[in-house]
Amino acid sequence: MARVDYINDDSAPAINSVVPSVVAIIRNSEGLILTIHKTDNDKWALPGGGHDPGESIAETVAREVLEETGYLVEIDELTGIYTNPRHVMAYTDGEVRQQFSIAFLAHTVGGSARTSSESDFVEWISREELSQRDVHPSMLQRIDDALAFQGSAAIR
């Protein structure tokens, strides 16, 4: 299902949904960040997705990362909560979500890279290289907040 993101755009459609979601900032021993190329918006992103009923938020992180990348992970820290009502995601099925994203630092504990129906590439990329890719500004904010993390989560 394709989507269009709007940030601070008065032409954005009216919000009809809020779904808590997660992203994981995962770095390898070389400091590279685990990223995926999303099939729904054709952008590079952190692995993550929507919280399902009946699961803990930690289970959401683990499930989404495994589904989108093939890696097993454990959470280290909460690095940010993002609820900008001017960041709207419109899906082709008519759902129009307000952003509600919780970001976590995590580390791999197993698995290996594989793509999914939501990700056609899985790559470890430097922060500098991400600046050269098509990455949504909200993802860069989450990455930068995580890289600057000093013990207090960003609330934006």
Predicted regions and their residues:
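Short connector loops at helix/strand junctions that flank enzyme active sites
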Residues: 19, 41, 46, 73, ...
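Acidic, metal-coordinating catalytic segment for phosphate/diphosphate chemistry
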Residues: 1-23, 94-95
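Active-site-adjacent beta-strand/loop module that shapes the phosphate/pyrophosphate-binding cleft
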Residues: 83-112
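A structural signal for short, well-ordered beta-strand segments
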Residues: 24, 78, 104-106
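Nudix hydrolase/Nudix homology domain
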Residues: 42-43, 112-156
